[in-house]
Structures are given as C-alpha cells and as structure tokens.
C-alpha cells in the first residue's frame, strides 16, 4: 500500500518533531510526536508547535522518546509486506529513514520498503492543508492531491 508521508522537524536539518503517514486507503493513519532534544527554533515555535497536538481523538498522545516512536512506526507498518512511502520533499524521507535507526548498526523491523519522491511544482502541502505545518494534515493534503491528479 502507498502511505503519504509528512514530517515536521526543528529547522533545516534539525531533529524530527512529528511524523505522519496517511495511507492511500484513507483509514488507520499514523501520527507520532517525537521528543526534541534541542531547543525549538523560533520559526518552528511559531508555525509548528501551536498545531502539533491538533489531531483527531485516538491519534493524539504525548511526545514519545525516539526509540518508542521508531517501534510504533515499525508496529504500524508490520502488516504490510511491501509498503511504499510517498513524499514531496527529500527531508521527509530522510527523517523517516533516520527514525528507523535505533543504535549504531541496528534498526527497527520493517518490510522491504519503496520510497517515491514526487516533484510537484505549484503544489504546497501547507497551502492545501486544513492545518498547515501539522504533519498529519499535510500528509492528508499530499494524499488528496496525488490521488486526485491520478484520476
């Protein structure tokens, strides 16, 4: 199955703050907030943090330690033998992959996974998102745009 990915992170090259997967099927979404070890940069403090908890009941929970978030992601994808992760920004894929790492030389269990990076000139997740700079709503916006363009 395809999963549309969005992440929020602490400025350019900064630590992961939240990660969302919106499956093509439209149900059983994944959303995790990750404890950030660094002080939050001002732009993120203004544009991301006020909206980070604005998710549907059942998806909201306290921020997780990085390892716990990695294990939650592994559990979420466990039933899919060939997930495809779709993103419109390279940093989203990089953050996803970095979350999989647990220690030097080790990672959480995950099936063989395909990554698709879409270059979408003129499309902005933030401009099309119900709650801009919220990873879940941005992932939903990406899913909606891609599925609509495929019709």
What annotation goes with each model-predicted range?
Residues 89, 125-151:
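Acidic, Mg2+-coordinating catalytic module of metal-dependent nucleases/exonucleases
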Residues 69-73, 92, 142:
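Alpha-helical packing segments of well-folded alpha/beta enzyme cores
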Residues 108-130:
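Short, flexible loop segments at boundaries between secondary-structure elements
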Residues 6-8, 92, 138:
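Acidic active-site catalytic centers that drive phospho-/nucleotidyl reactions
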Residues 75, 98, 144-148:
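Residue-level signal for well-ordered alpha-helical scaffold segments within enzymatic catalytic domains
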Residues 3, 8-87:
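Conserved non-catalytic scaffold segment of RNase H-like nuclease domains
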Residues 91-110:
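Substrate-recognition/cap helix-loop segment adjacent to the acidic, metal-dependent catalytic center
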Residues 12-14, 94, 144:
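Conserved protein kinase catalytic core
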């Amino acid at each position: 199955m395809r999963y549309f990915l969005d992440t929020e992170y602490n400025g350019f090259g900064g630590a992961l703050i939240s990660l969302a997967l919106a499956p093509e099927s439209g149900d059983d979404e994944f959303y995790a907030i990750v404890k950030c070890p660094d002080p939050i940069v001002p732009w993120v403090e203004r544009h991301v943090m006020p909206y980070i908890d604005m998710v549907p009941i059942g998806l909201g929970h306290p921020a997780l330690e990085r390892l716990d978030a990695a294990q939650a992601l592994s559990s979420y994808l466990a039933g899919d033998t060939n997930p495809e992760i779709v993103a419109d920004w390279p940093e989203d894929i990089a953050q996803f992959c970095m979350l999989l790492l647990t220690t030097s030389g080790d990672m959480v269990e995950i099936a063989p996974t395909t990554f698709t990076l879409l270059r979408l000139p003129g499309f902005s997740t933030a401009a099309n998102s119900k709650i801009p700079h919220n990873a879940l709503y941005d992932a939903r916006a990406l899913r909606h745009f891609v599925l609509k363009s495929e019709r």
